[in-house]
UniProtKB/Swiss-Prot annotation:
Source species taxonomy: Bacteria, Pseudomonadati, Pseudomonadota, Gammaproteobacteria, Enterobacterales
Signal peptide, first to last residue: 1-20
Covalently attached lipid (S-diacylglycerol cysteine), positions: 21
Keyword Signal tagged: yes
UniProt entry keywords in alphabetical sequence: Cell outer membrane, Cell shape, Lipoprotein, Membrane, Palmitate, Peptidoglycan synthesis, Signal
Subcellular compartments: Cell outer membrane
Coiled-coil features, chain-numbered ranges: none
GO MF annotations, alphabetized: enzyme regulator activity
Protein name: Penicillin-binding protein activator LpoB
Biased composition (Pro residues): 44-57
Region (Disordered): 29-82
Source superkingdom: Bacteria
InterPro entries attached to this UniProt entry: LpoB
PROSITE patterns: PROKAR_LIPOPROTEIN (PS51257)
Length: 221
């Protein structure tokens, strides 16, 4: 029993001696904290990415459409004045000579063609044709084919009432269609400011020109 107690006392003494051998200045290591399983460090929430706000493109303004450009004529060329002529003074003496021509049989039917313009300018032949028919209206030698008969005969050949008879063969065909024995041609030629009036009388049966004449025409304006 004493031996056992002695042994315990010896062990206690040795333990106390060992515990007192820690050198001064030595630091005990800091305790290490072990990370607990299942625990995580808190994290800051990441904000969602911002979406760009869609923008509506601005519509460009439409410029006002310009109105039609109206050009004011500057120094506009005035329209030429219509020329007028003294046709009656030119027709009467020529018709008188034609009625006295040899080979003209009294009582015959005469086809008068429209006056044809062969001048170097614009010339209204309507008044000339009217003056020619007027000079022949009261003659005692010819019976005139009416304007209505002549117009219908021209239309049958595809001509307008204002068209000239044209070729001699065409004139003969129309004259025979209306029963005329003579055709009187007339045309204005030369300078339009002072034209020359020419006439020809043709015998339908032979196509021969049995009379011709010419005279000056005076312009009144």
């Amino acid at each position: 029993m004493l031996n056992r107690m002695y042994r315990y006392a010896l062990l206690a003494t040795v333990a106390l001696a060992l515990s007192g051998c820690i050198l001064p200045g030595e630091q005990k290591p800091a305790p290490v904290e072990e990370a607990q399983p299942g625990t995580q460090q808190p994290t800051q929430p990441v904000p969602p990415p911002t979406q760009p706000v869609p923008t509506v493109p601005s519509v460009p303004s439409i410029p006002a459409q310009p109105g039609p450009i109206e050009h004011q004529p500057e120094n506009a060329t005035p329209e030429p004045k219509a020329r007028t002529y003294d046709w009656n003074s030119a027709m009467a003496p020529m018709v008188g000579k034609m009625l006295q021509a040899d080979g003209v049989n009294a009582g015959s039917v005469l086809l008068v063609d429209s006056v044809n313009n062969r001048t170097n300018g614009s010339l209204q032949t309507g008044p000339a044709t009217e003056a020619l028919r007027g000079a022949l209206a009261n003659n005692a030698k010819f019976t005139l084919v009416s304007a209505q008969q002549l117009s219908m005969a021209k239309q049958q050949l595809g001509l307008s009432p204002q068209d000239s008879l044209g070729s001699r063969s065409k004139a003969i065909g129309i004259a025979r269609n209306v029963g005329a024995q003579y055709v009187l041609y007339a045309n204005a030629s030369g300078n339009v400011n002072a034209p020359t009036l020419q006439m020809q009388l043709m015998l339908v049966q032979t196509g021969e020109i049995i009379w011709s004449g010419k005279g000056a025409v005076q312009q009144t304006q």
